[in-house]
């Protein structure tokens, strides 16, 4: 019988205090009061925010859980060596951005932070540790982590490591609900006795609130690939319905009606069939590109091309929407004030990573439009930094104004462009807004949340993704613009 290498987990550490690490560990602390959970990060300012009354990320329900558990069995610290030394189980939850240089530029994930954390664990471990990939990583990343940790074992017989894959399946804006009631928890590990022990310990943590039949165990590689494939399938759904939105605009069909009819087929289902200006966020594009790169590396060009098409449609949809705005505003937006409603990549989050708003705004800035931006959760500094990263700081200063309320953003504007589906945008007094705008006033609904008929009755010209144009000012006259 194999000796028990790993004892019962009583101390959990997460390296990385971002959108995944913070909420995940808050939920573990909430559901497992007998386990001490510590979130560590090199960014001392971020840790200070986690220890303050204003948390560094906005997520419905997060504040209540953090404030209840913090100081009891949930802690935030920048003392990484101490936390690693004391931990039984360590989550790696650091950023894995797309590489912007060298081999794999623009496609492959950059694993430098994962490697750095792995070396830090090897340096300060001191005893047996279960190491868990929480970051989205390419297939075989656990093998790289394990290689680093095994080298450390050669010099210290007290060190024993097992590397598991436990990808997150959170949707920002509903992360706490997703954590409290997940569709599934996926854990990948080795089939060795030690690997099975490590998997069992992580299963035991989740069993405190997740039914055992929702906890799936696989080999490590299947777990890593499943995460990429899940996000690729979701992104594919969005690109699929967005491609059909262009057909609807050209034919007089309504995308909402088409999606509703198609979604009634139980083999297809209705989720992720909401046409829009395009998907954003930290995961979808990054993970699809990672899958494309993997397929190219495996000499599977047809598969790589198939998934690259998902990204191509998303980029085309953003460009198409921006071109539509320009065309409908008499083919010029130069020096025209345009109000932008929404900057986050989706509602109920302040996250702006890969937001479609950034891309649409960039295209309009290239035409020298003057843009007045409002978002209820995104900080002004975040907006300006994001835009300066895709254009120039001078153009941002010259063309961008950030407002603290939507009425101010729309005052004197030629058009309103809805780029995030915030609930508050549905409830605004559009009669008042219309009175304060340039006429003819237009609304471009990139999220299909507004009542187009009611807006037309007020006097707006309306244009929505996947619907026939209202008044035919379009100089191009086709869905492709």
UniProtKB/Swiss-Prot annotation:
Q: Do the record's keywords include Transcription regulation?
A: no
Provide the free-text tissue specificity comment from this protein's UniProt record. Answer: Expressed in the vulva and in oocytes.
> What GO terms describe the biological role, i.e. biological process, of this protein?
egg-laying behavior; embryo development ending in birth or egg hatching; glycosaminoglycan biosynthetic process; morphogenesis of an epithelium; reproductive process; UDP-glucuronate biosynthetic process; vulval development
Enzyme class, top EC level, equals oxidoreductase
The reaction(s) catalysed by this protein are: UDP-alpha-D-glucose + 2 NAD(+) + H2O = UDP-alpha-D-glucuronate + 2 NADH + 3 H(+)
| InterPro entries the record matches | 6-PGluconate_DH-like_C_sf, NAD(P)-bd_dom_sf, UDP-Glc/GDP-Man, UDP-Glc/GDP-Man_DH_C, UDP-Glc/GDP-Man_DH_C_sf, UDP-Glc/GDP-Man_DH_dimer, UDP-Glc/GDP-Man_DH_N, UDPglc_DH_euk
Tell me the active site: 283
A single GO cellular-component term on record: cytoplasm
Work out whether the entry's keyword set contains Oxidoreductase. Answer: yes
Question: What is an example of a GO molecular function annotated in this UniProt entry?
Answer: UDP-glucose 6-dehydrogenase activity
Q: Which residues cross the membrane?
A: none
| Annotated metabolic or biological route of this protein | Nucleotide-sugar biosynthesis; UDP-alpha-D-glucuronate biosynthesis; UDP-alpha-D-glucuronate from UDP-alpha-D-glucose: step 1/1
Q: Give the record's family classification.
A: Belongs to the UDP-glucose/GDP-mannose dehydrogenase family.
The record describes the protein's role as: Involved in the biosynthesis of glycosaminoglycans; hyaluronan, chondroitin sulfate, and heparan sulfate.
Q: Keywords for this entry?
A: NAD, Oxidoreductase
Indicate the impact reported for residue 353 to H: In n2827; defects in vulva morphogenesis during L4 larval stage
Q: What protein does this entry describe?
A: UDP-glucose 6-dehydrogenase
Which positions are annotated as binding NAD(+)? 16-21, 41, 46, 94-98, 135-136, 172, 283-286, 353
Identify the EC number(s).
Answer: 1.1.1.22
Effects seen without this gene: RNAi-mediated knockdown causes a reduction in the size of cortical granules during the first meiotic division.
Q: Which residues bind substrate?
A: 168-172, 227-231, 267, 274-280, 345-346, 447
This chain's source organism reads: Caenorhabditis elegans
């Amino acid at each position: 019988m194999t000796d028990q290498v790993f004892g019962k987990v009583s101390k959990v550490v997460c390296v990385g205090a971002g959108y995944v690490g913070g909420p995940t560990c808050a939920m573990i602390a909430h559901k497992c009061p007998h386990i001490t959970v510590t979130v560590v990060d090199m960014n001392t300012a971020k840790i200070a925010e986690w220890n303050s009354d204003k948390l560094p990320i906005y997520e419905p329900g997060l504040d209540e859980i953090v404030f209840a558990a913090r100081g009891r069995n949930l802690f935030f610290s920048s003392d990484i060596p101490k936390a690693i030394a004391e931990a039984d189980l360590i989550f790696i939850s650091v950023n894995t951005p797309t590489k912007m240089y060298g081999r794999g530029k623009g496609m492959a994930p950059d694993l430098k932070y994962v490697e750095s954390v792995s070396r830090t664990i090897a340096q300060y471990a001191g005893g047996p540790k279960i190491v868990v990939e929480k970051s989205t990583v390419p297939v075989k990343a656990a093998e790289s982590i394990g290689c680093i940790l095994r080298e450390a074992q050669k010099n210290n017989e007290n060190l024993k490591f097992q590397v598991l894959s436990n990808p997150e399946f959170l949707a920002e804006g509903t992360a706490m609900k997703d954590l409290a009631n997940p569709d599934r928890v996926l854990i990948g590990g080795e089939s060795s006795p030690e690997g099975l022990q490590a998997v069992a310990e992580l299963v035991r943590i989740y069993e405190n609130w997740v039914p055992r039949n929702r906890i799936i165990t696989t080999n490590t590689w299947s777990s890593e690939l499943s995460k990429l494939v899940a996000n690729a399938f979701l992104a594919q759904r969005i690109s699929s319905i967005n491609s059909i939105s262009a057909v609807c605009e050209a034919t007089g069909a309504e995308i909402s009606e088409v999606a509703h009819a198609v979604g009634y087929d139980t083999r297809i289902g209705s989720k992720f069939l909401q046409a829009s200006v395009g998907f954003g966020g930290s995961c979808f594009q990054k993970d699809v590109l990672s899958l494309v790169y993997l397929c190219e590396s495996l000499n599977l060009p047809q598969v790589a091309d198939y998934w690259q098409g998902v990204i191509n449609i998303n980029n085309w949809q953003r460009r198409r929407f921006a071109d539509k705005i320009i065309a409908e505003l008499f083919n010029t937006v130069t020096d025209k004030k345009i109000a932008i409603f929404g900057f986050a990549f989706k509602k109920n989050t302040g996250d702006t990573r890969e937001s479609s708003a950034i891309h649409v705004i960039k295209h309009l800035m290239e035409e020298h439009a003057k843009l007045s931006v409002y978002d209820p959760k995104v900080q002004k500094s975040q907006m300006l930094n994001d835009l300066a990263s895709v254009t120039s700081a001078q153009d941002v200063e010259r063309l961008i104004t950030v407002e603290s309320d939507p009425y101010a953003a729309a005052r004197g504007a030629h058009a309103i462009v809805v780029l995030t589906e915030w609930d508050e945008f549905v409830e605004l007094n559009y009669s008042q807004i219309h009175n304060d705008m340039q006429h003819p006033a237009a609304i471009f609904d990139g999220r299909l949340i507004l009542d187009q008929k009611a807006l037309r009755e007020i006097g707006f010209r309306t244009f929505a993704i996947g619907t026939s144009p209202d008044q035919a000012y379009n100089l191009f006259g086709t869905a492709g613009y």
